[in-house]
Amino acid sequence: DRLNANIVVNQPRAMVFGETAFATDIRDQEFTGTDKEYLHRFIVCAAHTTTSIDEIWFDDKLAWDGTSVQGEFVGYLDVTTCLEGTAGAAVNISARMGTSRRYTGMTYVYFRYKLTGNSKKAESPFSSSVPTRITIKGKGMPTYDPRLDSTVTGGSGAMRADDQSTWAWDDDASRNPAVQAVTALLGWRINGLLSVGKGIPPRRIDLESFITA
């Protein structure tokens, strides 16, 4: 269940299309603080870059609205989103891992939970447990649309099947099953290596057929 955050060592890499709930694959976590009052958790949402992370829900409560922490979680939760992991975006929380948590090319969220109250009378919403049912909503990967590729018969534009830097999110096209299908056939690469999808060379795909699909 992609809405239940957990650690699964053989979890397949996630490919996310359209506007939907992302994967919640816990890749690492650790406690810090004198009394281990902070829990740090890294959740990888997709094995590729994505367009946006718009909302995060814990169970049925909005925890983050795309800009700031909400409701009872204010003062007890920090959220850092990364649409494409790089060395420069790595979060350093302790000497154990330093800046080695890069999740290169992937989309991830870093959570810091404060497990203790901010005063003697206050209680953290995470004092008894940290929610595992997490809904991370957003817009998925940029897609390739042959209608916007002038090298394909019937297409017009600068998008290219063999250059994913030209792919883009579109509110209509990126939710089109035909556009999603051809993007999945092409696959997404990180540093030149196939991360998700089939990785079929464009010359072996009838791109024109996806214009009329």
Where are the regions a protein language model picked out?
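Polar, S/T/G-rich
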Residues: 1-213
